[in-house]
Amino acid sequence: MWQTNEVAGKLIDEGTEVEIIGVKSTGDLSLGGNLSADVGQFVKSVDEKLLSGEVDIAIHSSKDVPVDYDNRISILGYLERGPTSDIILFSYKAEGSKKLNEVINSSVSHDLETILDTFPKGGRIGTSSVRRQSFFLSKRDDVVPLAIRGRVETRIERLLQGRVEGIILAEAGLHRLSLLDALPKGSSEINAMRISSEDWPTAPGQGAIVVHCLKDRLGELSWVNKRLNDYSTEVSVGEERRILQSLGGGCKTPVGVECVNGESRGYMAPENWREEYVSGNSFQLLPIDKYGITPQPENQAVPDDRGNPGHSSKLVSTLNSERMGNKLRNMGIEVLNTPVIELSEIKNNWPEFHLDVTIPRNEWPILILTSPFASRCASMMVEEIPDLGKIQWLAIGSGTARSCFRHGNPASICANASNSKELENYIKENIPSNVNLLIPRSSVGNNNMANNLKTAGFTVNSWVGYENSRKNVEFDEMNAQDVLLISSPSSAKSWDSNQLPVPDTVLCMGLTTKTEIQNIERFNNTEVIVLDGPVTESISQWWSENRK
């Protein structure tokens, strides 16, 4: 609404009578992570008022307007562009950072490498922008991306709540709130850094307010252009949008490009950047110029499926994680993925869900996801139950959060919990009890967490969302010095029922899995070790201490 008030104020100063008509966009009516599902969702609802004749002009942030848009609508003009940089806000005192207000009121920028050096390993970064996601993850693939939606004030509150270690916001929005003294309580204590535009070019049109009108009324409303339009902004934003269009871009295309004094430069993420990230492979940003030329990325090395067989022992894993396997192989650990469980969604069990958008958004239900497969099922069910995609998704840990990201529906919250008890405690400590919880579970899972949350005052809807069944497997490539990773109690049972060989050492995920293993006679002479922390990092540390 600030943008509309800014335009209205300038017209009123020129003696024009103005009536402001507020419109809720479809983008405003979602807290889900899939911001790119509908290109232009922040614009369409407003411009529909133009097409219906209810308003004469419509006001937007230029970066939200698709380059291929309704040809019945034209750009009437741009206000003078504000700051174009992005600012990263931290939940901690990052080395070299300053208080947010000090950063806003200065012109000091930091190169991206300096900023990345301050960000914790495995930290959570909050942004729904594919440009910001891909640019950050191209340098730090250990980081977990989370979707932080809503107004700038809401995103800052999420940071203050400790949901993420950092959020990335447009300087223009922060600058406006600072001028209005409207930053949330506690913002004065937030540390931040401005990201250098040399390393981090802006979204096309960022920092610019654009005015739309009907194409057939351009002549009639030309006086508005004369009173409002800033020619320099029109030229720079127009060039940035031209380059974006030449790249086939929109909200779904991770492009950063900035035009200054006729010179354009920027970067674009490769088409498969999301797949590379979730698979544990690195990817490089592609430089672009005013011609929109994007050199093809070099063929990236794909780890051998078996890793490096020169070592005397290997890891045999029931956790069929491509990312973990690739990461460990790149560290020189031979990995054989040997899943012994079949998982399949049970579509008919998923309940109908219709979101009541009239209730406050901080009371909207939250979908709780306890495994990567639960996130995969939820992503599939969004097609059947669209309102699931509008609410926040809470992932038990980084693996589940990355699975959400892989399937195009980033989680909004990552509990960093190692088991259901830790997840239960996280929910009790961080989620208000008036928020309804939706919890799909496995056919072999119990309802203990759901019942405990009900006892704590939550309204919980839990159902069997996917089938867990034993997979028939033949495997005889195990040596005594090899290491077996068992990911769940059901995997332990299936390994036993398949009568598969057992090495001297078993690594497992969670105390419940360890208890199940110790109850199986086949594992009686085996050392069982519970991994502590993120799985890949824990295995890497254990391997370096015990197998090298």
Tell what function each PLM region has:
Residues 32-60, 354-374:
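Short, structured active-site "lid" loops
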Residues 46-47, 155-156, 423:
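Short, hydrophobic alpha-helical packing/hinge segments within bilobed ligand-binding/sensory domains
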Residues 50, 159-160, 453:
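Hydrophobic residues within well-ordered alpha-helices
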Residues 52-55, 164, 252, 364, ...:
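Short, high-confidence coil segments that cap the C-terminus of an alpha-helix
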Residues 63, 71-142, 419-422, 427-431:
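A conserved helix-loop-strand patch within extracytoplasmic ligand-binding domains
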